[in-house]
Amino acid sequence: MFKLIKVALLAIVALAFTATAYADFTFVSWGGAYTMSQQKGYIDTWGPVKAGKTKIAVENYNGGLGEVKAQVESGNVKWDVVDILPVDAINGCDEGLFEPLNMASWEKGYLKSIADNGTGNPGTISECAAPQIWWTYVIIYDPKKFPGKKPTRMKDFFDVKKFPGKRGVHTWPQAVLEMALVADGVKPSKVNKVLQGEGGTDRAFAKLEDLKGHVVHWSAGAQPLELVKSGSVVMSIVYNGRAGAAILSEGASFDYIWEGQVLDGDWIAVVKGAPNKDEAIEFLKHATTCESQAEQAKYITYGPMRKCGLDIIKKGEPWFHNGIAVLPHMPNTKKRLKKSVLTDPVWWADHNAELKEQWSAWMAGNK
């Protein structure tokens, strides 16, 4: 009798462990093609999901730390994993909004591997955030609009006499000021030093005067593609992933100006007090493997933050899911990184508010 009870209790414990070992949890990201690439790249490929042991509910948000902070401070945490920008990774960890990850224990040489990304960035910006992708602000144009000499450098974007026509520019100053300095002759590797030094922002705004009267502003990621397609502008700043998807999946006729692209990144973190913290951390280990980062690139042209992911793509080209080569559309190849500006999220977090008035005045003068 007691033996049967013992066996029954062990069975109940085993079932309970099985039920909780891979609990369902929530993954929060930005939506659209990017979230789809995450779904196919490392959500659907995670062992517990493939085996039917867990389900991952995907939700979208508009970024920032507001909702994360509200959940943590209320003690009612509903989100588990969140895709975040660098400044939110840094600030969120400092404010105790994300779980420390102890990434050094994930796999042998992990920290060294994520630092080996070719950007000069140390790889780890926070003990609470794991590496995801590099994306970039880049210039695109329709080559049919320039039957003769084509624009190839950032200074061409600012030269409305040599390359006449409207330019698409987003409604916030990040990346625009960096691009202006590149167009003004600053080497991409020196842009942050100049921008952050005495008179740096004034120099950038002075260069922006070259575009006066030739700007169409956009605020949503799909808009600049439509502006170029329709001929409303001849060139535009865009997110490279949007442009890559339009070219590779839709056959759009765009070309890039890679010089002076402004490189940024996305990271993934576990919310402090997440209801399924252990499962979430195990998921992050899978999502940030070399193989998972390469798999995501089959569906979007953002670059793996780990170089080993990029190496897998190089060996497997043509890599995009429809059989087209993806590397010509990625921002973090060795050649392109030499001509890139790596954004400084901490500086922007500290100075964005003070630049807002000057930026708003510049935008108003370009209507």
Explain the meaning of each model-derived region.
Residues 23-91:
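Early extracytoplasmic/lumenal segment of secretory-pathway proteins
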Residues 32-39, 84-229:
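Extracytoplasmic ligand-binding site segments that recognize negatively charged/polar headgroups
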Residues 76-83, 217-218, 234-239, 255:
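Paired acidic/hydrophobic, glycine-rich loop segments that form the ligand-binding mouth/hinge
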Residues 88-91, 235-253:
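A ligand-binding cleft/hinge motif common to bilobed small-molecule-binding domains
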Residues 138-145, 181-183, 265-279, 295-298:
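A bilobed periplasmic-binding-protein/Venus flytrap-type ligand-binding module shared by bacterial periplasmic
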Residues 201-211, 248-274:
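Periplasmic-binding protein-like
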Residues 271-338:
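Mature extracytoplasmic/periplasmic domains
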Residues 333-367:
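Conserved C-terminal helix/tail region of periplasmic/extracytoplasmic solute-binding proteins
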